[in-house]
């Protein structure tokens, strides 16, 4: 099993509740009070009225919808996430990033045809987004189109050499092609970036394992587990799932070494 990695605030309502005093028109002192306070009341009304009538901007609305969509995707509610991203795109059809976001949710839900369509549309709108190339490469790898995947990972890294996810995913793909030495180079570079270390150590350990260097594999598996024990460790798919995968790989490696019963 290979674990590839894919890459708003609600506006506060301003309610101005204004109260006006009823002034007597029969008593002269009351008239003097009215003349003295009327200008101040008008100044308050003028200052408050624009705030009370201020509508939410299109940008604020998109930000709020996008935040809701991302939260829905994180909890696995793909239908809601897709519906929200679609709503954003209906209002802003030139948003390449939201085509990429919706494409990723389609990919996660298994709708590959719509996923690749959204990735292609995102790149047609903006060919400089390295995250789209990384996501489209993951699509190609899942389809067994490894050459296309490698080319897209290369494109992502040409645009952004610090895209650790692209280095990680390219290493996994090269390993699947049994190009273990080149895969290790990708993982080594990813580790220099200092992010997603637990995941990178796990995948590098798996590469050593499959290449026959069991000592190096065990060392990297242990390093990955140690990184998962650190606070605020961010790993694609969650720390628990990654730890389980590492334990499966370790058991697979150690099984031939156990004495027969």
Where are these regions (language model features)?
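Conserved alpha-helical positions within TPR/SEL1-like repeat arrays
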Residues: 63-74, 86, 97-108, 119-120, ...
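Terminal, low-structured helical/coil segments at or just beyond the last alpha-helical repeat
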Residues: 2-4, 8-9, 29-36, 40, ...
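TPR-adjacent "capping" and linker segments in tetratricopeptide-repeat scaffold/adaptor proteins
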Residues: 47-64
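Conserved structural position within tetratricopeptide repeats
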Residues: 87-90, 121-124, 154-158, 188-192, ...
């Amino acid at each position: 099993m290979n674990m590839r990695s894919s890459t708003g605030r609600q506006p506060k309502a301003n309610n101005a509740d204004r109260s006006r005093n009823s002034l007597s028109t029969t008593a002269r002192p009351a008239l003097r009070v009215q003349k003295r306070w009327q200008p101040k009341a008008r100044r308050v009304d003028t200052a408050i009225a624009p705030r009370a009538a201020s509508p939410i901007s299109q940008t604020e609305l998109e930000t709020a919808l996008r935040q809701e969509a991302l939260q829905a995707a994180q909890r696995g509610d793909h239908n809601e996430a897709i519906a929200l991203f679609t709503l954003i795109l209906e209002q802003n059809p030139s948003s390449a990033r939201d085509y990429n976001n919706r494409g990723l949710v389609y990919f996660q839900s298994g709708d590959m045809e719509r996923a690749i369509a959204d990735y292609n549309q995102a790149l047609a709108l903006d060919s400089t987004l390295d995250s789209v190339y990384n996501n489209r490469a993951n699509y190609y790898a899942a389809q067994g189109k490894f050459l296309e995947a490698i080319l897209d990972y290369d494109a992502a890294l040409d645009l952004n050499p610090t895209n650790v996810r692209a280095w990680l995913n390219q290493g996994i793909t090269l390993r699947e092609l049994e190009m273990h030495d080149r895969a290790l180079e990708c993982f080594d570079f990813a580790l220099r970036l200092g992010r997603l270390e637990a995941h990178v150590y796990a995948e590098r350990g798996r590469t050593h394992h499959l290449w026959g260097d069991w000592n190096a594999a065990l060392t990297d598996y242990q390093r990955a587990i140690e990184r998962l024990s650190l606070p605020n460790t961010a790993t694609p798919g969650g720390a628990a799932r990654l730890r389980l995968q590492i334990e499966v790989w370790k058991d697979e490696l150690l099984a031939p070494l156990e004495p027969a019963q």
